[in-house]
């Protein structure tokens, strides 16, 4: 991610003299922005300007343009952009966001920039999908962020099985509608990435993890398992249907089969417990006991292998989500930066 330098010299710009306090309004009163946050706001506003006007080619530029239009400030200059961005940050991240940042300098101010961008990216995830009958829709304007979410899903097929279009990236190209199942999968991905953005925001602020995200954002959360995890799906409680027994039997069979595969691959079953044989009559019981022990060992081995794979999958998914979260933060200003470099 391209960093935004926040050294003191770079922040001493003509725009700094324009808006150091958020304008008072009938509803909010005086600004709660700290001076450190005001400096970050000015720097971001300058990044979003092109030829004296707001450049709405980036995701953050689009969001800010919509906000300014709603307030009757469309087409405004740097003063209006700074004021609108300051207002947007407080709306999305809280009235007291950045209130204690005045003592920060150098790296601390750069961390505040990271907090702002991570927080805004996280808040924007909420608005990527619009609920509709039978599923959800999305806007072409949000494709820079949506495509990165879809790529994350394609990179983790165990967690997000391919849709009928062949890939989640292709799914976004077919039309702007996702059915119920695809919406659930997409929201699961949003939850996981939202958690990573929250972690980045907290880490930059030197805070303990806030958790939360956009719901229960964990790759194995209560409602984010889109792969039908057999450990969760095979419910055998009294409220289940008549198929519970057969499902439980199938689950046990799968564990035993997995355990057998592990043994054949060199896993072993450990050292069996030998029971003295006391004659032919006891041999039948001994054989049954040996079989029970064998099946029990295979079952345990299969369970261990399944849990190990699940743990590795969770680690891989979270690592991938962290990378996508960083890309999303960079994407907020990407349109503006690409044009500036051209």
Curated annotation (Swiss-Prot):
GO terms for biological process: monoatomic ion transmembrane transport; symbiont-mediated perturbation of host programmed cell death. Residues 200-248, 267-287 are annotated as: Disordered. The keyword Secreted applies. The keyword Nuclease does not apply. Sequence repeats lie at residues 211-217, 266-272, 277-280, 312-315. It comes from the Bacteria. Harpins are proteins able to elicit hypersensitive response (HR) in non-host plants and are required for pathogenicity in host plants. HrpZ forms ion-conducting pores permeable for cations. Such pore-forming activity may allow nutrient release and/or delivery of virulence factors during bacterial colonization of host plants. Pfam families: Harpin. Residues 277-315 are annotated as: 2 X 4 AA repeats of Q-T-[GA]-T. It is found in: Secreted; Host cell membrane. InterPro entries: HrpN/Z, T3SS_HrpZ. This is Harpin HrpZ. Its main location: secreted. GO terms for cellular component: extracellular region; host cell plasma membrane; membrane. Residues 211-272 are annotated as: 2 X 7 AA repeats of G-G-G-L-G-T-P. Residues 206-215 have a biased composition (Gly residues).
């Amino acid at each position: 991610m391209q960093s935004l330098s926040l050294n003191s010299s770079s922040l001493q710009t003509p725009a700094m003299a324009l808006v150091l306090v958020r304008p008072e309004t009938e509803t909010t009163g005086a600004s709660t922005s700290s001076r450190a946050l005001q400096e970050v706001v000015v720097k971001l506003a300058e990044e979003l300007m092109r030829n004296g006007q707001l450049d709405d080619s980036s995701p953050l530029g689009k969001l800010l343009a919509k906000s300014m239009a709603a307030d009757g400030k469309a087409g405004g200059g740097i003063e209006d952009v700074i004021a609108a961005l300051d207002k947007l940050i407080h709306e999305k991240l809280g009235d007291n966001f950045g209130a204690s940042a005045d003592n920060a300098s150098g790296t601390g101010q750069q961390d505040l920039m990271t907090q702002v961008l991570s927080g805004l990216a996280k808040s924007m995830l909420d608005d990527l999908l619009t609920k509709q009958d039978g599923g959800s829709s999305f806007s072409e304007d949000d494709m820079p962020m949506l495509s990165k979410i879809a790529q994350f899903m394609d990179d983790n097929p165990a967690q997000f099985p391919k849709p009928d279009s062949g890939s989640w990236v292709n799914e976004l190209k077919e039309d702007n509608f996702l059915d119920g199942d695809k919406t659930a999968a997409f929201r699961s991905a949003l939850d996981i990435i939202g958690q990573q953005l929250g972690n980045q925001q907290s880490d930059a602020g030197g805070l303990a993890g806030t958790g939360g995200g956009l719901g229960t954002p964990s790759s194995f959360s209560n409602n984010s398992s889109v792969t039908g995890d057999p450990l969760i799906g095979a419910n055998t409680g009294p409220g289940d249907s008549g198929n519970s027994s057969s499902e439980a039997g199938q689950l046990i069979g799968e564990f035993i089969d997995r355990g057998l595969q592990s043994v054949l691959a060199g896993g072993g079953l450990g050292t069996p417990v030998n029971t003295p044989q006391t004659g032919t009559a006891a041999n039948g019981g001994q054989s049954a006991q040996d079989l029970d022990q064998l099946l029990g060992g295979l079952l345990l081995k299969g369970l261990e292998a399944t849990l190990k794979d699940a743990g590795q999958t969770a680690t891989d998914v979270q690592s991938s989500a962290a990378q996508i979260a960083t890309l999303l933060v960079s994407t907020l200003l990407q349109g503006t930066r690409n044009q500036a470099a051209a």
